[in-house]
Swiss-Prot record:
It catalyses: guanosine(527) in 16S rRNA + S-adenosyl-L-methionine = N(7)-methylguanosine(527) in 16S rRNA + S-adenosyl-L-homocysteine. The keyword Repressor does not apply. Specifically methylates the N7 position of guanine in position 527 of 16S rRNA. S-adenosyl-L-methionine binds at residues 80, 85, 131-132, 146. Gene3D superfamilies: Vaccinia Virus protein VP39. Signal peptide: none annotated. It comes from the Bacteria. HAMAP family: 16SrRNA_methyltr_G. This is Ribosomal RNA small subunit methyltransferase G. Pfam families: GidB. GO terms for cellular component: cytosol. InterPro entries: rRNA_ssu_MeTfrase_G, SAM-dependent_MTases_sf.
Amino acid sequence: MSEHPLPASVAATLEQGLASMGLDAALAPPLLRYLALLHRWNGTYNLTAIRDPQEMVTRHLLDSLAMQPFVADGSLADLGTGPGLPGIPLAIACPGLQVTLVESNGKKARFMREAVRQLGLGNARVAESRAEALDEAGRYDQLTARAMDTLAGIVRVGGHLLRPGGVLLAMKGVYPHEEIAELPAGWQVREVTPLSVPGLAGERHLVTVTGP
């Protein structure tokens, strides 16, 4: 599928957001290519409930990139990534990061494979699988999950993927007091960091969790 042209205002919103977050303006062109592809495919395959490109910039791209300063080079598994969020924006922004995009939905996996191909992302691959069925135990330095389950639920289905000393980076809305209290034995919260996302009024927190 060819790219779908986006209004100039969408590019301006993204560029302003990147600037306010202190991120490189050179990230804008590949991010816009990804967004254009997502917008086009979404019309047919219903990959995300958000359909307005302006809203996609804020709630998908900038929200995903808010965690970028806390992501280290190495390997990262993005669990239940949907159409590639936050994994594809992170792969674009972090060339030293090897991202595995874990998603069991076939339509979303096909979209991501096409996006990875069109963007030439040599540091991203798609694993069409449920997280709990992925046979890659202890392989990842970092796990992330932006819209998947509670902290305990993420650990239950994906904790086996994390190497000793690795970290789970979980995107949450309001401070997740109850979820933290329900973490399994041996899993500890290292830090809860408030995040600021340009154009997003709601609370966002990044919860950093270490394994046993």
